[in-house]
Curated annotation (Swiss-Prot):
Native source organism of the sequence: Macaca fascicularis (Crab-eating macaque)
Molecular-function annotations in GO: calcium-dependent cysteine-type endopeptidase activity
Catalytic residues identified in the record: C73, H238, N263
GO annotation, cellular component aspect: cytoplasm
Role: Calcium-regulated non-lysosomal thiol-protease which catalyzes limited proteolysis of substrates involved in cytoskeletal remodeling and signal transduction. May play a role in insulin-stimulated glucose uptake.
Similarity comment text for this entry: Belongs to the peptidase C2 family.
Calpain catalytic domain span: 13-321
CDD domains (UniProt xref): Calpain_III, CysPc
Positions of the UniProt region annotated as Domain III 1: 322-494
Identification of the protein by name: Calpain-10
Gene3D superfamilies, A to Z: 2.60.120.380, Cysteine proteinases
Family annotation (Pfam families): Calpain_III, Peptidase_C2
């Protein structure tokens, strides 16, 4: 890989040191076909690629997505959702950014990506990968339009590299670009009796008719997992965009449903009955044929409903989102105006009880859902990837405890997620016998535990209290999640947390002499409640310095974070802490820059407990401990206790 040549700008333009124009931004392990272009890829800014670059086109068709050498059709299909909604587009790409013709242009580009409950603002430079002077990854229909390749670069930065985008789920990218929900509808069922096949056929027919109503409001994508004989041109593990649906009458008066499919590869790959010049068009009026064929853009083709159900395996559809930010039901078109969200974690040996087949199921995280009026309710469990998380700057980082995990973009989809499920019970009141309730059949539940980033339930719920229990399939499978609720009526959501009197006593210090220091502090909304490292406000958390004295070797240190609660208070905040080492010569280093580095040690995931503790060996030096709640603006008081073992040298008389 080498730097591209072009006109030298009159002023110094921004260069993103966190995502440089280098192999580290292109590749993660050179396991994909991209590796063969390693020596040929150059980096160029848009004004070095064409004479008059634009961010957006005047004609929307000129901004149509096209795939390059990168296997990220799943992401590009989701990007097409932004073309359907000005509101969503401006949510992801903030308007008013200086572009190439502006005096204020600095060579930077900012996007917002929704990550685990929050919109994360990510900035990078506008140097883009090229081959022979042309964009080698995504591009728009008109190559002087750059919103798509710039957004792709931001998304690659969030994931760690372009190669990390090789293979994924359209549904995941839709959620990242909208903050909403997405559903996957399988078009294939397990073959059974004739009756089952008939029911499946009627369900598929209803699905396609449903798409007619949703086509103008929702992004609809379809995928081929393994092409049938005679349709190899569709490719394997490839995603397409359903850009239009039309219901026609044939010459006999029978209904025909046609779907217009866009291939992100930018080429027409369909040889079915309704291809251009195909015999299917003889069934409809010539004027209709001329109209529909004239609408085709590069890479688009028409498919009849029966062909579609036979050749495609899956549909992914994003929930419509209004300009006010409310989701709309795919099934009833009602607005889901009421939303709630809470984080949680499955902790090995504590709250990772496994599925309902395991005796430990009652130990899983549990949540109260109160429904105030008859409502259509969606409850979703969103997992955090076990391999990557996004830090304050929008950069991908390895999760604590996973730094030695290997991953290849060619891995099985879902390999870096747990198999998760969700079950819901209705109860008469909040004070119930939980083991007894959990032994009864739930009122709703996922059909199975799935290796998906997010699973959700759709329920019609009457007023009352409900108990929601997200779980992993395997016991002691660790992970973090976000429980989200969307409802047409008023709802409240709260976590069932450990009772203080049942909290585990503080572990005794190992034998020996210990020096102990106690530090008191508090988290205050808008001031010192910065939340976890996933949020840009993390550096505002309280930060306490401490030191380990010189000695023959590392010292044993126990750090304990205790949140102050009333004796009857059962609602703990999820808490944790990180330890940062101050570099030699950095005695006066300010806390914020230090906290943007990787911590030396961590006590995470954040736990719903009154107290968390970590015993560690630390070499002599200066350190800072930063206690935090999981979410920003969560208020509370706490005490940090630092106990350092004192090594006494023997005295000689």
């Amino acid at each position: 890989m080498r730097a591209g040549r072009g006109a030298t700008p009159a002023r110094e333009l921004f260069r993103d040191a966190a995502f440089p124009a280098a192999d580290s931004s292109l590749f993660c392990d050179l396991s994909t076909p991209l590796a063969q272009f390693r020596e040929d890829i150059t980096w160029r800014r848009p004004q070095e690629i064409c004479a008059m670059p634009r961010l957006f086109p005047d004609d929307p068709q000129e901004g149509q997505v096209k795939q390059g050498l990168l296997g990220d059709c799943w992401f590009l299909c989701a990007c097409a959702a932004l073309q359907k909604s000005r509101h969503l587009l401006e949510q992801v790409i903030p308007p008013g950014q200086p572009s190439w013709a502006d005096q204020e242009y600095q060579g930077s580009f900012t996007c917002r990506i929704w990550q685990f409950g929050r919109w994360v603002e990510v900035t990078t430079d506008d140097r883009l990968p090229c081959l022979a002077g042309r964009l080698c990854f995504s591009r728009c229909q008109r190559e002087d339009v750059f919103w798509l390749p710039l957004l792709e670069k931001v998304y690659a930065k969030v994931h760690g590299s372009y190669e990390h985008l090789w293979a994924g789920q359209v549904a995941d990218a839709l959620v990242d670009l909208t903050g909403g929900l997405a559903e996957r509808w399988s078009l294939k069922g397990v073959a059974g009796s004739g009756g089952q096949q008939d029911r499946l056929g009627r369900w598929e027919h209803r699905t396609c008719r449903q798409l007619l109503r949703l086509k103008d409001q929702s992004l609809i994508s379809c995928s081929v997992l393994s092409p049938r004989a005679g349709a190899r041109e569709l490719g394997e593990f490839h995603a397409f965009i359903v850009s239009d649906l039309r219901e026609l009458q044939d010459q006999a008066g029978q209904s025909i449903l046609l779907l217009r499919i866009q291939n992100p590869w930018g080429r027409r790959c369909w040889q079915g009955l309704w291809r251009e010049g195909g015999e299917g068009w003889s069934q409809v009026d010539a004027a209709v044929t001329s109209e529909l064929l004239s609408q085709l853009q590069e890479g688009e083709f028409w498919v009849e409903e029966e062909e579609f159900l036979r050749e495609f395996d899956e549909i992914t559809i994003g929930y419509p989102i209004t300009e006010a930010g409310h989701l709309q039901s795919l099934y009833t078109e009602k607005l889901l105006c009421h939303t709630r969200a809470l984080p949680g974690a499955w902790v090995k040996g504590q709250s990772a009880g496994g599925c309902r087949n395991n005796s430990g199921f009652p130990s899983n995280p549990k949540f109260w859902l109160r429904v105030s009026e008859p409502s259509e309710v969606y409850i979703a469990v969103l997992q955090r990837s076990r391999l990557r998380a996004v830090d304050w700057a929008g950069r991908a980082r390895a999760l604590v405890g996973d730094s030695h995990t290997s991953w290849s973009p060619a891995s099985i989809p879902g390999k870096h997620y747990q198999a998760v499920g969700l079950h819901l019970w209705k109860v008469e009141k909040r004070r119930v016998n939980l083991p007894r309730v959990l032994s009864t059949p739930p009122v709703a539940g996922t059909a199975c535990h799935a290796y998906d980033r997010e699973v959700h339930l759709r329920c019609e719920l009457s007023p009352g209290y409900y108990l929601a229990v997200p779980s992993t399939f395997l016991k002691d499978a660790p992970g973090e999640f976000l429980l989200r609720v969307f409802s047409t009526g008023r709802v409240s959501l709260s976590a069932i947390r450990a009772v203080a009197k049942n909290a585990s006593p503080r572990a005794a210090l190992p034998a020996g002499e210990w020096g102990t220091v106690q530090l008191r502090g508090s988290w205050r909304a808008g001031q010192t409640a910065g939340g976890s490292r996933n949020f840009a406000s993390y550096p505002t958390n309280p930060c306490f310095p401490f030191s380990v004295p010189e000695g023959p070797g590392p010292r044993c240190v126990r750090i304990t974070l205790h949140q102050h609660c009333q004796p009857r208070d059962t609602e703990f905040h999820p808490i944790g802490f990180h330890i940062f080492q101050v570099p030699e010569g950095g005695r006066s280093q300010d806390a914020p820059p230090l906290l943007l580095q990787e911590p030396l040690l961590s006590c995470v995931p954040h736990r719903y407990a009154q107290e968390v503790s970590q015993l560690c060996l630390l070499p002599p030096g200066t350190y800072r401990v930063v206690p935090s709640t999981y979410l920003p603006d969560t208020e509370g008081a706490f005490t940090v206790t630092i106990a350092t073992r004192i090594d006494r040298s023997p005295s000689w008389q």
